[in-house]
UniProtKB/Swiss-Prot annotation:
One of its GO terms (molecular function) is tRNA-uridine 2-sulfurtransferase activity. Catalyzes the 2-thiolation of uridine at the wobble position (U34) of tRNA, leading to the formation of s(2)U34. The gene is mnmA. This is tRNA-specific 2-thiouridylase MnmA. It comes from Koribacter versatilis (strain Ellin345). One of its GO terms (cellular component) is cytoplasm.
């Protein structure tokens, strides 16, 4: 890449993105720092259990301050891009709607797919930057044989973020740099220290950025209250897969597939949530074996390594961020739908989550489990 070109660095205020900026600056690139302001932590801080205003991850004022301080240290221009309205529309509201209907959403993927990369590239273009660079642990390069950009798993498997990036387009991949793709997290912290960044020991972000305490149930209650609404009545029956009513629950949003605790039913053997039937307000429970399945369907597919799925393909399929990819066969069942058949049964396949498909290190594509 021509070092006279300008790169916009997405700066979250964390170690990873700050190190990316320091690395590229040291290599002689022209840089501009950009922070996406997505959520005002003060909005719900008055609600019980949400802590002091401004406390949080990724969206807090502390993180903006840290990003600005790094930009000043590196002597690069820095801008904050306010996208709170779009974030609420495209990420927060779908998150709330999904939980209330019995699905378990992934807001980080929604944010990457529908907002973050799109807006970063738009802003970069407006300020004269040809590419963006982020602190994600992933790799990308152009495959001359297929004529397509590829997204690949990083060197540090423990930090692999490709699961959340399956929605990236060819245009986005062609204009994005992932400088940390060949590094491990300890190496990144050491690089940050060597570059004189005071935040080299800053803890990693763990929570959903707009739910800093991790309690999504309190968030739902607080957010709906702010909107002048209240939690809808989604209470209903606890039933077995055969239809036997074994109890009642106070709201379908309190459960997710695979959950064992908090069912309120005493039996001779452990029970787990097998399925959530939002239309009937039923929580289906059963034993652990009933959580196992060999098949799933996914919709709203995004293909990366291939332009489309012309015939059945052998892949490794990943059904949640911490899930070890498992051998499976995929085949199209509709214009935007695939059937994934695993060699071995997988536990707790959850509607609302993503399934991401791999050919070795290469992300073939991904979609939303239905």
């Amino acid at each position: 890449m021509n070092k006279s070109e300008t790169i916009a660095v997405a700066m979250s205020g964390g170690v990873d993105s700050s190190t990316v900026a320091a690395m590229l600056r040291a290599e002689g690139y022209n840089l501009v720092g950009l922070t996406m302001q997505l959520w005002n932590q003060r909005r719900l801080a008055h609600h019980e259990g949400f802590g002091e205003p401004g406390v949080g991850r990724c969206c807090s004022l502390d993180d903006v301050y840290d990003a600005r301080r790094v930009a000043e240290t590196l002597a690069i221009p820095y801008y904050v891009v306010n996208q709170e309205d779009r974030f609420e529309r495209d990420v927060v509201k779908p998150f709330v709607e999904d939980y209330l209907s019995g699905r378990t959403p992934i807001p980080c993927s929604l944010c990457n797919n529908h907002l973050k990369f799109d807006q970063l590239l738009r802003t970069a273009q407006q300020i004269g930057a040809e590419k963006i660079a982020t602190g994600h642990y992933a790799r990308n390069d152009f495959n001359a044989q297929t004529g397509r950009w590829e997204l690949k798993r990083p060197a540090d498997r423990a930090k692999d973020q490709t699961y959340f990036l399956f929605g990236l387009t060819q245009e986005q991949l062609s204009r994005t740099l992932f400088p940390l793709g060949h590094k491990t997290k300890p190496e990144v912290r050491e690089d940050a220290k060597n570059h004189g960044l005071k935040l080299f020991e800053k803890p990693d972000s763990q929570e959903i950025c707009f739910i800093p305490n991790g309690d999504y149930k309190k968030f739902l209650d607080a957010y709906l209250e702010e909107q002048g609404e209240s939690l809808p009545d989604t209470s209903g029956e606890l039933v077995t897969s055969s239809g036997e009513v074994v109890g009642h629950h106070t709201g379908i949003h309190n459960f997710t597939v695979g959950q064992r605790k908090g069912l309120g039913v005493a039996t001779g053997s452990p029970l787990y949530v097998i399925e959530l039937r939002g239309d009937k307000r039923q929580v289906v429970v059963g034993n652990n074996d009933e959580l196992l399945t060999r098949n799933l369907r996914a919709k709203r597919m995004n293909w990366i390594a291939v332009s489309d799925l012309a015939q059945p393909m052998r892949v490794h399929a990943k059904i949640r961020h911490k899930h070890e990819p498992a051998w499976a066969t995929i085949e199209k069942t509709g214009d935007d739908e695939v059937l994934v058949t695993f060699d071995d049964p997988q536990r707790a396949v959850t509607p609302g989550q993503a399934v991401v498909l791999y050919d070795g290190d290469v992300v073939v594509g991904g979609g939303w489990i239905c």
